[in-house]
Regions:
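A conserved structural/catalytic subdomain of Rossmann-like adenosyl-cofactor enzymes
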Residues: 117, 123-124, 128-336
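Conserved S-adenosyl-L-methionine
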Residues: 12-138, 145, 162, 170-171
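Nucleotide 5′-phosphate-binding alpha/beta core
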Residues: 9
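Long recognition/docking surfaces used for binding and targeting
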Residues: 1-6
Protein backbone atom coordinates (compact mmCIF):
# COMPACT_ATOMS: atom_id res chain seq x y z
CA UNK A 1 0.00 0.00 0.00
CA UNK A 2 2.90 2.36 0.72
CA UNK A 3 5.16 1.29 -2.14
CA UNK A 4 4.84 4.67 -3.86
CA UNK A 5 6.47 6.30 -0.82
CA UNK A 6 9.94 4.92 -1.40
CA UNK A 7 12.61 7.59 -1.81
CA UNK A 8 16.35 7.39 -2.11
CA UNK A 9 17.37 9.80 0.62
CA UNK A 10 15.85 7.91 3.54
CA UNK A 11 19.21 6.84 4.99
CA UNK A 12 20.71 10.28 4.52
CA UNK A 13 17.71 11.91 6.18
CA UNK A 14 17.57 9.31 8.96
CA UNK A 15 14.04 8.36 7.89
CA UNK A 16 13.01 4.69 8.07
CA UNK A 17 9.42 4.17 7.00
CA UNK A 18 7.33 2.11 9.42
CA UNK A 19 5.78 -1.06 7.93
CA UNK A 20 1.99 -0.73 7.86
CA UNK A 21 1.40 -3.75 10.11
CA UNK A 22 3.78 -2.28 12.72
CA UNK A 23 1.99 1.07 12.48
CA UNK A 24 -1.29 -0.71 13.14
CA UNK A 25 0.28 -2.50 16.13
CA UNK A 26 1.44 0.79 17.67
CA UNK A 27 -2.03 2.28 17.23
CA UNK A 28 -3.66 -0.68 18.97
CA UNK A 29 -1.14 -0.59 21.83
CA UNK A 30 -1.88 3.13 22.29
CA UNK A 31 -5.57 2.20 22.68
CA UNK A 32 -6.75 4.40 19.82
CA UNK A 33 -10.52 4.58 19.23
CA UNK A 34 -13.02 6.89 17.55
CA UNK A 35 -12.75 9.47 20.33
CA UNK A 36 -8.95 9.57 20.53
CA UNK A 37 -6.81 12.60 19.75
CA UNK A 38 -3.63 11.23 18.22
CA UNK A 39 -0.35 12.95 17.51
CA UNK A 40 3.06 11.98 16.13
CA UNK A 41 6.12 14.19 16.73
CA UNK A 42 8.22 12.73 13.89
CA UNK A 43 5.54 12.05 11.32
CA UNK A 44 7.67 10.99 8.36
CA UNK A 45 5.33 9.84 5.60
CA UNK A 46 2.39 9.80 8.07
CA UNK A 47 2.13 6.02 8.11
CA UNK A 48 1.33 6.00 11.83
CA UNK A 49 -1.33 8.69 11.47
CA UNK A 50 -2.91 6.85 8.53
CA UNK A 51 -3.10 3.73 10.71
CA UNK A 52 -4.60 5.77 13.55
CA UNK A 53 -7.15 7.39 11.24
CA UNK A 54 -8.22 4.00 9.87
CA UNK A 55 -8.57 2.58 13.39
CA UNK A 56 -10.67 5.57 14.47
CA UNK A 57 -12.90 5.43 11.38
CA UNK A 58 -13.41 1.67 11.73
CA UNK A 59 -14.38 2.07 15.38
CA UNK A 60 -16.83 4.83 14.47
CA UNK A 61 -18.45 2.69 11.78
CA UNK A 62 -18.89 -0.20 14.21
CA UNK A 63 -20.27 1.80 17.13
CA UNK A 64 -22.31 4.59 15.49
CA UNK A 65 -25.59 3.52 13.86
CA UNK A 66 -26.95 6.89 12.69
CA UNK A 67 -25.70 7.73 9.16
CA UNK A 68 -25.79 11.47 9.87
CA UNK A 69 -23.95 11.13 13.17
CA UNK A 70 -21.39 8.84 11.54
CA UNK A 71 -20.74 11.35 8.75
CA UNK A 72 -20.19 14.12 11.30
CA UNK A 73 -17.85 11.94 13.33
CA UNK A 74 -15.81 10.92 10.29
CA UNK A 75 -15.38 14.57 9.33
CA UNK A 76 -14.37 15.46 12.89
CA UNK A 77 -11.79 12.67 13.03
CA UNK A 78 -10.13 13.86 9.84
CA UNK A 79 -10.29 17.57 10.65
CA UNK A 80 -9.57 17.74 14.38
CA UNK A 81 -8.43 14.44 15.91
CA UNK A 82 -5.07 13.91 14.16
CA UNK A 83 -1.91 16.00 14.35
CA UNK A 84 1.55 15.36 12.95
CA UNK A 85 4.84 17.24 12.90
CA UNK A 86 7.60 16.76 10.33
CA UNK A 87 10.73 18.89 10.02
CA UNK A 88 12.00 17.79 6.59
CA UNK A 89 10.12 19.62 3.84
CA UNK A 90 10.42 16.81 1.29
CA UNK A 91 9.09 14.23 3.73
CA UNK A 92 6.39 16.63 4.92
CA UNK A 93 5.01 16.78 1.38
CA UNK A 94 4.92 12.98 1.29
CA UNK A 95 2.94 13.00 4.53
CA UNK A 96 0.37 15.43 3.13
CA UNK A 97 -0.01 13.43 -0.07
CA UNK A 98 -0.22 10.15 1.82
CA UNK A 99 -3.00 11.41 4.08
CA UNK A 100 -4.96 12.76 1.12
CA UNK A 101 -4.66 9.52 -0.85
CA UNK A 102 -5.66 7.45 2.17
CA UNK A 103 -8.83 9.44 2.79
CA UNK A 104 -7.51 12.83 3.97
CA UNK A 105 -6.85 13.88 7.52
CA UNK A 106 -4.06 16.23 6.49
CA UNK A 107 -5.60 19.30 8.15
CA UNK A 108 -3.05 19.32 10.95
CA UNK A 109 0.15 17.97 9.40
CA UNK A 110 2.66 20.70 10.25
CA UNK A 111 6.08 21.42 8.76
CA UNK A 112 7.68 22.23 12.13
CA UNK A 113 10.39 21.13 14.53
CA UNK A 114 8.39 19.38 17.24
CA UNK A 115 11.18 19.89 19.79
CA UNK A 116 11.61 23.65 19.44
CA UNK A 117 8.86 25.23 17.31
CA UNK A 118 5.66 23.54 18.48
CA UNK A 119 3.52 24.89 21.32
CA UNK A 120 0.93 22.10 21.45
CA UNK A 121 -1.73 23.97 19.49
CA UNK A 122 -3.63 23.11 16.33
CA UNK A 123 -1.94 24.23 13.14
CA UNK A 124 -4.87 25.49 11.09
CA UNK A 125 -8.35 26.75 11.86
CA UNK A 126 -8.07 26.32 15.62
CA UNK A 127 -4.54 27.68 15.91
CA UNK A 128 -5.20 29.27 19.31
CA UNK A 129 -6.54 26.03 20.79
CA UNK A 130 -4.40 23.33 22.38
CA UNK A 131 -4.60 19.90 20.76
CA UNK A 132 -6.05 17.60 23.50
CA UNK A 133 -3.77 14.64 22.73
CA UNK A 134 -4.52 11.40 24.56
CA UNK A 135 -2.68 8.97 22.26
CA UNK A 136 0.92 9.25 21.08
CA UNK A 137 2.61 7.08 18.45
CA UNK A 138 6.18 7.48 17.25
CA UNK A 139 9.03 6.04 15.21
CA UNK A 140 11.69 8.73 15.80
CA UNK A 141 14.99 9.38 13.99
CA UNK A 142 17.41 7.14 15.88
CA UNK A 143 20.30 9.57 15.47
CA UNK A 144 18.53 12.09 17.70
CA UNK A 145 19.40 12.53 21.38
CA UNK A 146 18.81 9.32 23.31
CA UNK A 147 18.05 7.48 20.05
CA UNK A 148 14.97 9.71 19.81
CA UNK A 149 13.71 9.52 23.39
CA UNK A 150 13.88 13.32 23.48
CA UNK A 151 10.81 13.31 21.21
CA UNK A 152 9.03 11.04 23.67
CA UNK A 153 9.85 13.26 26.64
CA UNK A 154 8.65 16.34 24.79
CA UNK A 155 5.34 14.82 23.67
CA UNK A 156 4.45 13.19 26.98
CA UNK A 157 5.18 16.42 28.86
CA UNK A 158 2.43 18.10 26.82
CA UNK A 159 -0.23 15.45 27.52
CA UNK A 160 -2.66 15.34 30.44
CA UNK A 161 -3.79 11.72 30.03
CA UNK A 162 -3.80 8.73 27.71
CA UNK A 163 -1.34 6.19 26.35
CA UNK A 164 1.74 6.11 24.15
CA UNK A 165 3.39 3.43 22.01
CA UNK A 166 6.76 4.03 20.39
CA UNK A 167 9.17 1.91 18.38
CA UNK A 168 12.80 2.85 18.90
CA UNK A 169 16.35 1.49 18.83
CA UNK A 170 16.59 -0.75 21.90
CA UNK A 171 19.79 0.87 23.17
CA UNK A 172 17.50 3.73 24.23
CA UNK A 173 16.30 1.47 27.02
CA UNK A 174 19.68 0.13 28.07
CA UNK A 175 21.80 3.22 28.58
CA UNK A 176 21.71 5.55 25.58
CA UNK A 177 18.84 7.60 27.05
CA UNK A 178 19.40 7.01 30.76
CA UNK A 179 18.73 10.53 32.03
CA UNK A 180 15.80 11.13 29.67
CA UNK A 181 14.20 7.84 30.75
CA UNK A 182 14.52 8.76 34.42
CA UNK A 183 12.79 12.08 33.76
CA UNK A 184 10.02 10.40 31.74
CA UNK A 185 9.21 7.98 34.57
CA UNK A 186 8.77 10.84 37.03
CA UNK A 187 5.49 11.61 35.27
CA UNK A 188 4.62 8.47 33.24
CA UNK A 189 4.42 4.70 33.73
CA UNK A 190 6.19 2.11 31.57
CA UNK A 191 3.61 -0.61 30.93
CA UNK A 192 5.44 -2.90 28.52
CA UNK A 193 8.71 -3.44 26.66
CA UNK A 194 8.54 -5.53 23.48
CA UNK A 195 11.61 -6.86 21.69
CA UNK A 196 10.89 -6.75 17.95
CA UNK A 197 12.38 -8.99 15.20
CA UNK A 198 15.95 -8.06 14.28
CA UNK A 199 15.08 -8.02 10.56
CA UNK A 200 11.99 -5.84 10.96
CA UNK A 201 13.42 -3.08 8.73
CA UNK A 202 15.34 -5.41 6.40
CA UNK A 203 16.86 -3.55 3.48
CA UNK A 204 16.55 -0.19 5.27
CA UNK A 205 18.14 -0.63 8.69
CA UNK A 206 19.68 -3.42 10.75
CA UNK A 207 19.11 -1.92 14.20
CA UNK A 208 17.46 -3.92 16.95
CA UNK A 209 14.24 -2.20 18.02
CA UNK A 210 11.89 -2.33 20.96
CA UNK A 211 8.38 -1.02 21.44
CA UNK A 212 7.76 0.80 24.71
CA UNK A 213 4.20 1.35 25.92
CA UNK A 214 3.36 4.05 28.48
CA UNK A 215 0.46 5.24 30.55
CA UNK A 216 0.66 9.02 30.43
CA UNK A 217 0.59 11.44 33.37
CA UNK A 218 0.96 8.77 36.05
CA UNK A 219 4.29 8.54 37.87
CA UNK A 220 5.97 5.14 37.62
CA UNK A 221 5.59 3.27 40.91
CA UNK A 222 8.65 1.09 41.73
CA UNK A 223 6.20 -1.71 42.61
CA UNK A 224 4.45 -1.53 39.25
CA UNK A 225 4.75 -4.75 37.22
CA UNK A 226 6.14 -4.22 33.72
CA UNK A 227 5.47 -6.73 30.93
CA UNK A 228 8.61 -7.78 29.01
CA UNK A 229 7.79 -9.63 25.80
CA UNK A 230 10.19 -11.25 23.34
CA UNK A 231 8.50 -10.84 19.95
CA UNK A 232 11.55 -11.91 17.92
CA UNK A 233 9.33 -14.50 16.26
CA UNK A 234 6.36 -12.48 15.03
CA UNK A 235 5.29 -15.12 12.53
CA UNK A 236 6.61 -13.34 9.44
CA UNK A 237 9.49 -14.36 7.19
CA UNK A 238 11.16 -11.39 5.51
CA UNK A 239 13.43 -11.12 2.50
CA UNK A 240 14.92 -8.16 0.64
CA UNK A 241 14.16 -8.84 -3.00
CA UNK A 242 13.06 -6.62 -5.85
CA UNK A 243 9.62 -8.24 -6.04
CA UNK A 244 7.95 -6.71 -3.00
CA UNK A 245 5.03 -9.16 -3.08
CA UNK A 246 7.22 -11.98 -1.77
CA UNK A 247 9.28 -10.02 0.74
CA UNK A 248 6.84 -10.58 3.62
CA UNK A 249 5.27 -13.99 4.15
CA UNK A 250 3.12 -15.23 7.01
CA UNK A 251 4.84 -18.51 7.89
CA UNK A 252 3.85 -18.98 11.53
CA UNK A 253 0.44 -17.53 12.45
CA UNK A 254 1.55 -13.89 12.25
CA UNK A 255 -1.93 -12.37 12.55
CA UNK A 256 -2.71 -14.48 15.60
CA UNK A 257 0.65 -13.57 17.17
CA UNK A 258 0.05 -9.84 16.74
CA UNK A 259 -3.44 -10.18 18.23
CA UNK A 260 -2.06 -12.13 21.19
CA UNK A 261 0.68 -9.55 21.72
CA UNK A 262 -1.89 -6.77 22.02
CA UNK A 263 -3.98 -8.84 24.44
CA UNK A 264 -0.95 -9.61 26.60
CA UNK A 265 -0.05 -5.93 26.89
CA UNK A 266 -3.61 -4.78 27.53
CA UNK A 267 -4.94 -7.65 29.65
CA UNK A 268 -2.05 -9.76 30.93
CA UNK A 269 -0.71 -13.28 31.24
CA UNK A 270 -4.05 -15.09 31.01
CA UNK A 271 -3.89 -14.55 27.24
CA UNK A 272 -0.71 -16.61 26.83
CA UNK A 273 -1.28 -19.12 24.04
CA UNK A 274 1.18 -19.03 21.14
CA UNK A 275 3.84 -17.33 23.27
CA UNK A 276 5.92 -19.40 25.68
CA UNK A 277 6.75 -18.62 29.31
CA UNK A 278 10.26 -17.73 28.13
CA UNK A 279 8.85 -15.04 25.82
CA UNK A 280 6.65 -13.35 28.42
CA UNK A 281 8.15 -12.06 31.66
CA UNK A 282 6.71 -9.79 34.34
CA UNK A 283 8.86 -7.90 36.81
CA UNK A 284 9.56 -4.43 38.19
CA UNK A 285 12.06 -1.79 37.14
CA UNK A 286 13.83 0.92 39.10
CA UNK A 287 12.52 4.35 38.00
CA UNK A 288 15.85 5.83 39.10
CA UNK A 289 17.86 3.50 36.88
CA UNK A 290 16.89 4.43 33.31
CA UNK A 291 18.83 1.51 31.82
CA UNK A 292 16.64 -1.47 32.76
CA UNK A 293 13.91 -1.29 30.13
CA UNK A 294 15.01 -4.35 28.10
CA UNK A 295 14.76 -7.22 30.56
CA UNK A 296 14.16 -10.83 29.55
CA UNK A 297 13.06 -13.96 31.36
CA UNK A 298 15.89 -15.36 33.53
CA UNK A 299 17.43 -18.60 32.34
CA UNK A 300 16.79 -21.49 34.75
CA UNK A 301 20.16 -23.21 35.24
CA UNK A 302 18.88 -25.81 37.74
CA UNK A 303 19.29 -29.37 36.39
CA UNK A 304 16.12 -31.36 35.81
CA UNK A 305 15.60 -35.08 36.46
CA UNK A 306 15.98 -35.67 32.73
CA UNK A 307 19.34 -33.86 32.80
CA UNK A 308 20.46 -36.04 35.73
CA UNK A 309 19.41 -39.26 33.99
CA UNK A 310 21.22 -38.25 30.81
CA UNK A 311 24.41 -37.44 32.75
CA UNK A 312 24.33 -40.83 34.53
CA UNK A 313 23.61 -42.59 31.24
CA UNK A 314 26.52 -40.84 29.52
CA UNK A 315 28.84 -41.72 32.41
CA UNK A 316 27.85 -45.41 32.42
CA UNK A 317 28.31 -45.57 28.66
CA UNK A 318 31.80 -44.12 29.07
CA UNK A 319 32.66 -46.65 31.82
CA UNK A 320 31.43 -49.60 29.77
CA UNK A 321 33.36 -48.35 26.75
CA UNK A 322 36.58 -48.17 28.80
CA UNK A 323 36.04 -51.67 30.22
CA UNK A 324 35.51 -53.12 26.77
CA UNK A 325 38.64 -51.39 25.50
CA UNK A 326 40.63 -52.86 28.42
CA UNK A 327 39.39 -56.36 27.73
CA UNK A 328 40.24 -56.08 24.05
CA UNK A 329 43.78 -54.91 24.80
CA UNK A 330 44.25 -57.80 27.28
CA UNK A 331 43.16 -60.37 24.73
CA UNK A 332 45.52 -58.89 22.16
CA UNK A 333 48.45 -59.18 24.59
CA UNK A 334 47.65 -62.84 25.33
CA UNK A 335 47.73 -63.65 21.65
CA UNK A 336 51.27 -62.33 21.16
Amino acid sequence: MYSWLGFTQDKLNDVVLTPSYVAQLLVRLARVNKDSYVWDFATGSAGLLVAAMNEMLNDARVTITSPDELARKEALIKAEQLLGLELLSSVYMLAILNMILMGDGSSNILNKNSLTDFDGKYGFGKDNTSFPADAFVLNPPYSAEGNGMNFVERALSMMQKGYAAIIIQNSAGSGKAKEINKRILKHNTLLASIKMPSDLFIGKSSVQTNIYVFKVAEKHDPKHIVKFIDFSNDGYTRTNRKKASINLRDTDQAKERYDELVNLVLYGKQYLNLFTEKEYYETTIDPQNGCDWNKSAPVDTRPTLADFKKTISDYLSWEVSNLLKGQTQGEDNLGK
